[in-house]
Amino acid sequence: GTYEYVIRGYQMARVWNFSAGPSCLPEDVLKECAAEMMDCNGTGQSVMEMSHRSSAFEPIIQDAEAMVRKLMKVPENYKVLFVQGGGSTQFAMVAENLGIHTGKAAYIETGVWAKKAAQEAAKLGVEVTTIASSKDKGYSYIPKVEKIEGDYDYAYICFNNTIMGTHYEYIPETGNIPLVADISSCVLSEELDVSKFGLLFAGAQKNLAPAGVTLVIIREDLIPELDDCRPGTPTMLAYKTHADNGSMYNTPPCYTIYVLDKVLHWIEKNGGAAGINKLNVEKANYLYDYLDNSDFYRATAEKGSRSLMNVPFLTKYSVAGATDEAVLAKEKEINSKFVKEAEAAGLVNLKGHRLVGGMRASIYNAMPLAGVKALVEFMKKFAEENK
């Protein structure tokens, strides 16, 4: 299950990392970063030490933006921003900057992150309407909302839901209502028509980079003057602050942006969004096919709503609605045994989210097919030994 490489004579075993984020990065990128750690591009310094205003760093952030535009085919009337605070800060920024005309917004609740976003907007005084929810079935599917109408300032969706392993197979029609999407866990895992959205954002630590930077793509006409944001909006939470200052109003997370730039070049080398998507479909199908044909495991997300990135699954010892102590104890025992033995076999971070239980394999862009195959081999062995 593990593969090895050597750094300066130290033998190190790499594990297959199925973490929901921060998650594995492409090995080629890590090697490049290691090689440039002490001296990047002949500057005699590490990117970690560079002044963000220096001629050494400027080309890095400019290239990162250019690569985002190229790979995501971003239309010219959109700004590409690099901000801090993760996806969670975007819950507030979206509300503060977009909820300013009627003060109303429509949210589709497909899980924890969409719900938190709606709660944050409501907290800031936006009149939030939850127009659809999949809570009735434990968020195991994406509700069909083909069309969103009304006097909303914006409509909000979480495009891929990491905890429940669900993903939109369609983009809701919103007419003149700007559509906002959290694409943190699926950015560049597939082709996406940016022009169908008013705003896209992605915390980078799942598919793009280490934690510390959030990518925002916003249509220019949706960026209000600071004074037009909701009352009391802090300067740092206005998109205009970042748009007017080339994402350098204050010190950006330089090193994270540098790694992001390298990951974008790695994606391009692998065929761009379309090429990566082909690989992602192959990986996900390999795992789902095994789960669907197994009498020991089952996937929790409904067909037609399944994520290519996050695959939660249960064993036969997880009984829906069980209250019997013995049954619950057995379930807990099997789950922790699975996680522990997987770890010993070099397959790490497979523990499921407490809301779903069981296990979860996050198989983002950087996870190779070999990692998924290693997981399935382990699952077969575990099923055989514990049936």
Each model region followed by its residue ranges:
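Active-site C-terminal subdomain of aminotransferase-like
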Residues: 26, 204-288, 302
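PLP-dependent aminotransferase-like
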Residues: 88-155
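Short, Lys/Arg-enriched N-terminal segments with co-localized hydrophobic residues
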Residues: 1-11
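Active-site phosphate-binding strand-loop segment of PLP-dependent enzymes
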Residues: 21, 121, 133-187
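Conserved N-terminal alpha-helix of the aminotransferase class I/II PLP-enzyme fold
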Residues: 43-90, 97, 112, 120
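PLP-dependent enzyme catalytic core of the Aspartate aminotransferase-like
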Residues: 9, 14-15, 337, 344, ...
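Conserved PLP-binding catalytic core of the aspartate aminotransferase-like
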Residues: 297-342
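A glycine-/small-polar-enriched, mobile loop at the entrance of the PLP active site in fold-type I
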Residues: 14-65
